[in-house]
């Protein structure tokens, strides 16, 4: 279980000198899919990760040190809140720099053990999400895993949830509003960062 968390630093671009002694979990997804809200819910802190009121405005790579506990043993991991992608109102030049920085970061950051790909449960087959999944698979190492997490599941009825789970069998459905699915997600995060993931 996650017992505490604190903000460490923000980066505008990849810095190879900022190494990590801990396993890391990267949160990726479209702008406004709920990355910051999910981090806050997992860490049980309302304002740990700041979500921007303007989708696409948050362009920093934010790091959080998270203390976890498993079988009475405490250990630390890092959560990485990545800029939301695919928002049209970001200028083309900024978008290119942004994508280049993220590309370098994701490929070279060997301490990342889990990529959490957040997808809005009401829009599950957007081209941008399909492209992100394919992109991550191209450089995924044996000690890394991609986990699809469908957000805002409180907007779905039981039948829609069952259909979604049946289509994406290894995914997790979550809701920040009613805390649905957060315990299961927490277990996967801890297992994967400890090297116990399936």
Curated annotation (Swiss-Prot):
Quote the protein name from its UniProt record.
Probable GTP-binding protein EngB
Q: Which GO terms describe its molecular function?
A: GTP binding; metal ion binding
InterPro entries, A to Z: G_ENGB_dom, GTP-bd, GTP-bd_ribosome_bio_YsxC, P-loop_NTPase, Small_GTP-bd
Give TM segment ranges: none
User: Which metal ions or organic cofactors does this protein require, according to UniProt?
Assistant: Mg(2+)
Q: Which SUPFAM superfamilies match?
A: P-loop containing nucleoside triphosphate hydrolases
List the gene name: engB
Q: Name the residues that bind GTP.
A: 29-36, 56-60, 81-84, 151-154, 174-176
One Pfam match: MMR_HSR1
* Described function: Necessary for normal cell division and for the maintenance of normal septation.
Task: Tell me where in this chain the EngB-type G domain is found.
Answer: 21-195
Q: Which controlled-vocabulary keywords does the entry list?
A: Cell cycle, Cell division, GTP-binding, Magnesium, Metal-binding, Nucleotide-binding, Septation
Q: What is an annotated GO biological process for this record, any one?
A: division septum assembly
Give the similarity note: Belongs to the TRAFAC class TrmE-Era-EngA-EngB-Septin-like GTPase superfamily. EngB GTPase family.
In this chain, Mg(2+) is annotated as bound at: 36, 58
Q: Which GO terms describe its cellular component?
A: cytosol
